Amino acid sequence: MKIDILTLFPDMFAPLEYSIVGKAKDKGILEINYHNFRDNAEKARHVDDEPYGGGQGMLLRAQPIFDTFDKLNVTKPRVILLDPAGRTFNQAYAEELAQEEELVFICGHYEGYDERTKTLVTDEISLGDFVLTGGELAAMTIVDATVRLIPEVLGKEASHKDDSFSSGLLEFPQYTRPAEFRGMKVPDVLLSGHHVNIRRWRMEQSLRKTWERRPDLLENYDFTDEERQILEEIKSEGK
């Protein structure tokens, strides 16, 4: 996968050189390029200006962004604009983006963008109902969530399939050695070696956590008969 990031602050992306994303780059699975669109700004490198019609704040001018985009070595990229008014990012969206060969991120700053910038864009994405100072943190979040889903990045294909949201449910609790720590014990079923019971316990825990914390995820979830039965048992406990 090739990723190009248009930003005023390329140094902010240093964390992407570490951990999973950094390893993907080292393996040659991923290429990331950073482009400071101030370098292509006319008018003494000014990238912003006052909005027509008046209003608070400054808007990013279209010219520096367009000229930077025109210089990218891309064919048919998915072009992502980070915007609080965009479609909310989630795990399903990350899985969708992980299928792409080329991604371009446009990171805003100041009050917003000249609307004409959006003619370059295929996707407007938001992390949620809040506003960040710029799009850089949002872009890093999306890159990390997406890159880890690329085959060969995590090593084991199944290693992300049990993550929260990958299955449509929140992840079940997990434990490692020792079996008891400061009086807190690992559930007996996980020490039993009985794989059927362990699988059912994990299913029950995942459903319980989702029901208690994110019941909205269950609205469109495709239940198996066993899962539906377990969920009904969980619901009946509170009656």
From Swiss-Prot:
Q: Which residues bind S-adenosyl-L-methionine?
A: 108, 127-132
Q: What does the record give under GO molecular function?
A: tRNA (guanine(37)-N1)-methyltransferase activity
User: EC number(s)?
Assistant: 2.1.1.228
Question: What GO terms in the biological process aspect are recorded for it?
Answer: tRNA N1-guanine methylation
The record's listing under CDD domains reads: TrmD-like
Say yes or no: keyword Metal-binding present: no
Q: Which Pfam families match?
A: tRNA_m1G_MT (PF01746)
This protein's UniProt keywords: Cytoplasm, Methyltransferase, S-adenosyl-L-methionine, Transferase, tRNA processing
This enzyme catalyses: guanosine(37) in tRNA + S-adenosyl-L-methionine = N(1)-methylguanosine(37) in tRNA + S-adenosyl-L-homocysteine + H(+)
Q: Where in the cell is it found?
A: Cytoplasm
Is the keyword Chaperone in the record?
Answer: no
Q: Which Gene3D superfamilies match?
A: 3.40.1280.10, tRNA(m1g37)methyltransferase, domain 2
For this protein, the record's InterPro entries field holds: Alpha/beta_knot_MTases (IPR029028), tRNA_m1G_MeTrfase_C_sf (IPR023148), tRNA_m1G_MeTrfase_TrmD (IPR002649), tRNA_m1G_MTases_N (IPR029026), tRNA_MeTrfase_TRMD/TRM10 (IPR016009)
Query: GO CC annotations?
Result: cytosol
Per the entry, what this protein does is: Specifically methylates guanosine-37 in various tRNAs.
Q: How does it assemble?
A: Homodimer.
Q: Which family does it belong to?
A: Belongs to the RNA methyltransferase TrmD family.
Recorded protein name is tRNA (guanine-N(1)-)-methyltransferase
Q: Write down the species.
A: Streptococcus thermophilus (strain CNRZ 1066)
